[in-house]
UniProtKB/Swiss-Prot annotation:
PROSITE patterns: ATP_CONE. GO terms for biological process: negative regulation of DNA-templated transcription. It comes from Latilactobacillus sakei subsp. sakei (strain 23K). It comes from the Bacteria. This is Transcriptional repressor NrdR.
Length: 157
């Protein structure tokens, strides 16, 4: 493994432990050349998952792209990086559980929209405003009212 500090290819594993319910191995490494310590993660390579975009083009599912969208939506909100990573994990697991190699970007967005209100309502509205591309204030208000209806129903249960 190349050291991110000195770029030498000689590191040793100091600590290794499973994370993410055993699906990922976290390894602490130390460069034998400069003694810089860094962390790597190993996960099983799975068949590529393609996302079909609105215009019909296909691109590989990108966890980082989804995480960046969540980070933007949750900016300056009390949402931890761990929570956002868990959302990405949950969405990817749901998609892979379908057993398909392709999924629409709409389905990916809907999976996120199903989880996000339980984490942070403001992040949900921000994500929805980009994902649903609100054209005007009326569409935005309709989304808010729908969310408030669901919240009220949840409170009554």
């Amino acid at each position: 493994m190349l050291c991110p500090h000195c770029h030498q290819n000689s590191s040793r594993v100091i600590d290794s432990r499973p994370t993410d319910e055993g699906r990922v191995i976290r390894r602490r490494r130390e460069c034998e050349n400069c003694q810089f310590r860094f962390t790597t993660f190993e996960r099983v390579e799975q068949t590529p998952l393609l996302v079909i975009k609105k215009n019909g083009t296909r691109e590989e599912f990108n966890r980082d792209k989804l995480l960046r969208g969540l980070i933007r939506a949750a900016e300056k909100r009390p949402v931890t990086m761990e929570q956002m990573t868990e959302i990405v994990d949950e969405v990817e697991n749901k998609i892979r559980a379908l057993g398909e190699n392709e999924v629409s970007s709409q389905a990916v967005g809907e999976y996120v929209m199903a989880v996000l209100p339980g984490v942070d309502e403001i992040a949900y509205i921000r994500f929805a405003s980009v994902y649903r591309q609100f054209k005007d204030m009326n569409v935005f208000m309709a989304e808010l009212q729908e969310m408030m209806k669901k919240e009220k129903a949840r409170d009554q249960d």
